[in-house]
Each structure stands twice: as structure tokens, then as C-alpha cells.
Regions:
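Mixed-charge (Asp/Glu-Lys/Arg
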Residues: 1-120
């Protein structure tokens, strides 16, 4: 639901991003738009019962190009399949599992998040 997206957006705000939760219209499934220091990142939030599969990341990759995003990010609660992890390797797509954030105790997972997004 929408509260999930809001919670994720707040995590990014905590590390200095502006995060705009999009209202589901013609945005190619983008849930949150992040901006910081000239970077613009398209975020999709997935609350699945099982791991996020390759079709999700392929769709995001296409959407990023169509809408002119340099970077993308998928946030989930259930992890990612190997296919997704491989696909993301050489692309500017960051994979974030919320469970890892909850597990990483350092300042509420902020260090982990910054790391995942390649923040300097």
C-alpha cells in the first residue's frame, strides 16, 4: 500500500535525498522519485510473497530509459532472484532488501543505504 512507499521514502530522506512518492499515473510503475546533487533515481517498491524476478528489473530498465532516469532502485521485503542480481550488476540499478536495513544497526541502516546507492 501507499504507507509502504511513504516509509521507504522517509528512509531516503534520512540520508539527504528529496523523495517524492508518485501517485500511480502513467509513470511506468515508478513509486518514488529520488533526487540529490543532480542525481535522479527512479524507485520501485515491491511487496511480494516471493523474491523479485527478472521481469521486474527489465521493466524498470526500460522505464528508466523512456523517462530519462540515469539510475534506478528496487526496494523489496523478500530479496531478489539471481537473475535480477546478475542483470543489475553492470547497470545503474540498486537492489535494496529492507530486511538488510532492519538488520544493520548502524544509525538505522543509513550507512547501509548510502552504501547501496553508491553515495560518497
Amino acid at each position: 500500500g501507499h504507507s509502504f512507499e511513504q516509509a521507504v521514502a522517509n528512509l531516503f530522506r534520512n540520508i539527504g535525498y528529496t523523495a517524492e512518492v508518485s501517485n500511480r499515473g502513467g509513470d511506468g510503475g515508478i513509486d518514488i522519485i529520488l533526487e540529490k546533487a543532480g542525481r535522479k533515481i527512479a524507485v520501485q517498491c515491491k511487496r511480494y510473497k516471493s523474491s523479485v524476478g527478472p521481469h521486474v528489473i527489465r521493466d524498470l530498465w526500460g522505464t528508466m530509459h523512456n523517462l530519462g532516469y540515469d539510475e534506478g532502485c528496487i526496494v523489496t521485503t523478500t530479496g531478489f532472484t539471481k537473475g535480477v542480481i546478475d542483470f543489475a550488476k553492470d547497470k545503474n540499478i540498486y537492489l535494496i532488501d529492507l530486511n538488510d536495513i532492519l538488520r544493520s544497526t548502524s544509525n538505522g541502516g543509513e550507512f547501509y543505504l548510502r552504501n547501496r546507492l553508491g553515495d560518497r
